[in-house]
Structures are given as C-alpha cells and as structure tokens.
Amino acid sequence: MRHIFQRLLPRRLWLAGLPCLALLGCVQNHNKPAIDTPAEEKIPVYQLADYLSTECSDIWALQGKSTETNPLYWLRAMDCADRLMPAQSRQQARQYDDGSWQNTFKQGILLADAKITPYERRQLVARIEALSTEIPAQVRPLYQLWRDGQALQLQLAEERQRYSKLQQSSDSELDTLRQQHHVLQQQLELTTRKLENLTDIERQLSTRKPAGNFSPDTPHESEKPAPSTHEVTPDEP
C-alpha cells in the first residue's frame, strides 16, 4: 500500500503542475516578439480615379474638388493638350480666363506647346506662379515639374537667340573678310601682271645682240661727200 502511494504521489504532483507550465508558456510566448511573422505595411486606404480612359474632348469639362486635386487628371490633361494643334490650343485656352488657379493652370498646359513667344511663356508662368500657394499639395509636385519644364524652354529660347546674334555677327565678319579677300585678290592679280610684263621686257632685252662702236649711219672720215654742183668754188689766184 505504501509502495503504491509513493508511486501515485509524484504523478499527482506532475499533473497538478501542468496548468502552471501552460500559463508560463503563454506568458513567454506573449512577451516574445514575433520575428517570423512579417510586419504588415500600413498603406493608407485612399484610391485615385484614373482618367486614362477619359476622352480628350471631355477632359476639359470635368471639374470639382475630387477632380482638380487628382494629379492623374492633370497628367491626362497634359497628354490631351499635346495632341492639339496650336490654333486649337489657343482657342481652348480662351475659355479659362477667370483667374482661378485651376483655369490658369489649364491655360498654361494648353499654351505650353502652342508655339508661343518667350515673352508670352514668361508671362504665363508668372501668372500661375502668383497662384501657386492655392495649388493643393497633391498637385504641387506635378506643377513644379511643369514649371521646371517651362523654365528650360525659356532658357533654350535665350540660347537660340544668343546663337542667332552670334551667327549674324559672324556672317557680317565673314562678309567683310570676303570683301577684303576680293580686294587683295585683285591687287595680287595686278601685281602679277606687272611682274609678267617686266619679265617679258627683260627677256626681250636679253635676246638682243650688243652693237659695236661702228654705226652704219655715221659716215667714215675718208668718205667725204662730193661737193654739190650748186656749191660755188672760189677762183684760184
């Protein structure tokens, strides 16, 4: 009997300790960080409407806060503006002259590739820049990229104008050099002809034989001319 009691006692103690061990394991697992499970990324639940399928004929009529604060709308507007002819862009831009940032930005997008002058482009950028504080934060990065593109266009126009002036100056200098070259060429030809004439004269002089002291035209002393019959001969004494 005692032997049986000794065998059952440790088993009862072991069974009684199982709940404690289970609780201890739960506490340890609770405090242990979950290394194996990947951390879930917190993505804001916010979806933007995609205007890629919107017809270009309808894109300009869309308005409202949800549309005007959507950068995808402005990207689609830029894409549609690139497909217009310059005259069409100017005609469309005349409809947005109320002075709001939305319509001013639309004007800028439409006129950017309408073959405007650098002065018109500079004035256009200045008007939009004056309203830049009203542009929503969602659209501001896109607007800044557009503004940087316009600044590059103005810089390119200045470089072209500077190159044109240099080319005109170079052309004028080239014309002057051509005229000087023509004058020098004429002088060189005249000098060459003079040298050729002098060379011919020297050649002619060198081919002549040198003459002696006797001249056939001069009569010899012994050959005096006979007195003329008309000469009067004095009488001898």
Swiss-Prot record:
NCBIfam families (UniProt xref): PRK10722.1
Name of protein: Quorum-sensing regulator protein G
Organism: Escherichia coli O157:H7
General function of this protein: Involved in the regulation of virulence and metabolism in EHEC. Required for pedestal formation in host epithelial cells during infection. Necessary for translocation of effector molecules into host epithelial cells, but is not involved in structural assembly of the type III secretion system (T3SS).
Recorded name of the encoding gene: qseG
Lipidation (S-diacylglycerol cysteine): C26
Signal peptide (UniProt feature, chain positions): 1-25
InterPro entries recorded: QseG
Keywords for the protein's UniProt record, in alphabetical order: Cell outer membrane, Lipoprotein, Membrane, Palmitate, Signal
Cellular compartments per GO CC: cell outer membrane
Chief location category: membrane
Keyword Metal-binding: no
Taxonomic classification: Bacteria, Pseudomonadati, Pseudomonadota, Gammaproteobacteria, Enterobacterales
Keyword Signal attached: yes
Effect of a null allele: Mutants are unable to form pedestals.
Subcellular localization: Cell outer membrane
